[in-house]
Amino acid sequence: MLVISRKSGESFMIGDSIEVKILRIEGSEVKIGISAPSHVKIYRAEIYQKIVKENKMAVQVDIVDLSEVIFLDRNK
């Protein structure tokens, strides 16, 4: 992991097109701004983890349901 120290008002770049700017520091909270192309998806980590979990659940196939489909197809 790369660790970068920045003060309020300073920024850093990720690649050529993503800028992360430190807007404000209040106690233990840091407010940041991110400038990125519209095709770049930006999520808070906890939201991204929920999306990944939901996607995994959506593609799970119940083995019993799958075997029923195979059985029904053979009886045609």
Curated annotation (Swiss-Prot):
Example of a GO cellular component annotation carried by this entry: cytosol
- Does S-adenosyl-L-methionine appear among the keywords? no
MF annotations from Gene Ontology? mRNA 5'-UTR binding
Q: Where in the cell is it found?
A: Cytoplasm
**Which GO biological process annotations does it have?**
bacterial-type flagellum organization; mRNA catabolic process; negative regulation of translational initiation; regulation of bacterial-type flagellum assembly; regulation of carbohydrate metabolic process
What the entry lists under InterPro entries is as follows: CsrA, CsrA_sf
Which keywords does this chain's UniProt record carry? Bacterial flagellum biogenesis, Cytoplasm, Repressor, RNA-binding, Translation regulation
Q: Where is the signal peptide?
A: none
In the UniProt record, does the keyword Repressor occur? Answer: yes
- Name the protein family: Belongs to the CsrA/RsmA family.
Its subunit composition reads: Homodimer; the beta-strands of each monomer intercalate to form a hydrophobic core, while the alpha-helices form wings that extend away from the core.
| Free-text function comment from the UniProt entry | A translational regulator that binds mRNA to regulate translation initiation and/or mRNA stability. Usually binds in the 5'-UTR at or near the Shine-Dalgarno sequence preventing ribosome-binding, thus repressing translation. Its main target seems to be the major flagellin gene, while its function is anatagonized by FliW.
Q: Which PANTHER family match?
A: CARBON STORAGE REGULATOR
Full protein name: Translational regulator CsrA
Provide the organism lineage as a comma list. Answer: Bacteria, Thermotogati, Thermotogota, Thermotogae, Thermotogales
